[in-house]
Structure formats: C-alpha cells, structure tokens
Amino acid sequence: MNNLQVSMNHKKITIDNNIVIDFMEEFPNKLKEFFTLSGNSHVFDREITYLSEKANIIIVISHKIKIYIIFKDYIYLDNTILNSKIVRRFIKKYPILASSYELINPMKLEFKNSNIVWDCLSFTYDAKQAAITLLITTLN
C-alpha cells in the first residue's frame, strides 16, 4: 500500500510503518536501502499514498534536504490552489497549520509555523503538468 506519514513534531517520514527515515539521525543508509540514487536525488521506486492520493516521492540532499511529494492525478484548478482537495485534506490532517499559510500566488501556497520542525512546507500547482507538488524543506 505504501502509505506515507509526515511528522510535524519530528523531522521524519514513515512509509507503511516499517520504513522510517529520521532526518535528525543517520538517514543516508536508510535512503540507500529503500531509495534509488539518481544524481543527488533519492527516488522511492514504488508509488505511495498520501492524503488519500497516489504520489511519488523524491528526496534531494544538498545544503538543504528537500522532500518532493508529487501527486499523480491530473488536477485542474478553478481558482486557487487553496480550493484543491489535496490542500484541504492537508489542512484538516494538520490543524496546527490551518492559520499559518500564505497564498503567494494562485498556484503557490506556503506554510510557516514555529510549532513545527520543518523549515518550510509549500504546495505548488504546475498548470502544464496539471499536477500538485508538496515540497518539504529543512537544513541538512
């Protein structure tokens, strides 16, 4: 099933309760074990489910850790990214973030909250691909 969980209290992600990647500990070995390396990107070879949607996950390691969750279903926005069911589910799942977002433009939404461990969470809509991506960043 490959269900993804993203913790807001710890810099960690979990896939199906058995693959735990804690970005505060020695995580490169876990990435090597479960992800395929392509340049400086680590790609999870199987499709995941997050917020009840199919997605792919890519982790890029540089001076920052960037976790890309790329949702697979084609999405056509009527107005802004705030109206998408993915963003609405995200806000419902993490109510602590409900009042800490900024709509940068109709296609980009950022969450910043001192009560979470991640440096930045942002949703971006790519109209050409008709896809939404969640980007989670933290310092390495």
Identify the role of each PLM range.
Residues 1-109, 113-117, 126-140:
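Short helix/turn-capping signatures at newly exposed starts of structured segments
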